[in-house]
Regions:
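Beta-propeller blade termini and top-face loops
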Residues: 1-271
């Protein structure tokens, strides 16, 4: 039989199983994070944990956290700080370059149930050492200083649905862009502080799941992708969104969900 680990055989009615993958790799990676100055990579995999690959070339990786592997991050200014998650808001952290890992947060809703998505979107703001993750339709989970064990808190914002995509501005300190499962887009300034402010910059005609956000040559150039069928799946604004408008730029892509979109850093006219 087959599952998310590959192909297996039982000849005794399920008492024992034999791995029949024959070195075939079937693992699905939800995410990867790349070290800023080496060949080191970590990645979260579907039901197969978070794995570390330390050098280039063909090799066997090392599992660093078990269970499901979710979104992974490496601080690009201090690679000692690395993060992964299993499910929901169960976040693991390494403070020594990935040599050891421990549970950093396991944050649940007030009624004790899991909050966020099963594979939960998150993002790092390395400049301000802040960590953000989806939580519920009215709040975003926030860790203001992930270099310490300070208590987490939340950004209060009426999202209308769960946050499904994040992007920290590469241009303006403390600016966080947020997309939602209901097709809305928000810009949060000073997101790492207690005096943050929120503005909605959503397109007027979208209600599908926003799967990614990217920022172009400045904070006014924003790209979003949507994940559904029968819709325009790629939108761009060059005026900051909201009343300044968004343009569908899907072109002749087939009618299928778009999972991620990125600008060409050498030519912001290309996606």
């Amino acid at each position: 039989f087959t599952n998310d680990g590959g192909v297996f055989l039982t000849t005794d009615g399920g008492t024992t199983f034999t791995d029949k993958n024959n070195n075939m790799v079937t693992t699905q990676f939800y995410s990867t994070a790349i070290h800023p100055s080496s060949d080191y990579v970590i990645g979260g995999t579907q039901d197969n944990g978070t794995w570390r690959i330390s050098t280039s070339g063909k090799q066997i990786g090392t599992e660093v956290v078990g269970g499901d592997g979710g979104f992974t991050h490496i601080d690009q200014s201090n690679s000692n700080y690395q993060f992964t998650a299993t499910t929901y808001n169960r976040v693991y952290k390494s403070s020594n370059g990935g040599n050891s890992w421990s549970l950093y947060h396991d944050v649940q809703a007030s009624d004790g149930t899991d909050a966020g998505f099963f594979i939960n979107p998150s993002v790092l703001d390395a400049n301000n050492k802040a960590f953000y993750a989806s939580f519920d339709a009215t709040t975003i989970f926030r860790q203001k200083d992930y270099t310490s064990l300070t208590a987490h808190d939340f950004i209060n914002v009426n999202l209308g649905s769960l946050a499904s995509a994040f992007k920290v501005s590469p241009h303006t300190d403390g600016v966080l862009f947020v997309g939602t499962a209901g097709g809305r887009v928000f810009k949060i300034t000073d997101a790492h502080t207690s005096s943050y402010s929120v503005s909605e910059i959503s397109p007027s005609s979208t209600s599908a799941y926003i799967s990614s956000i990217d920022v172009g040559k400045d904070d006014n150039q924003i790209l979003i992708t949507l994940s559904n069928y029968g819709i325009e799946s790629v939108y761009e604004t060059v005026g900051g969104g909201g009343s300044n408008g968004w343009t569908a730029v899907e072109g002749d892509l087939p009618d299928m969900p778009i999972r991620w979109g990125l600008y060409n850093r050498n030519n912001f006219n290309q996606v």
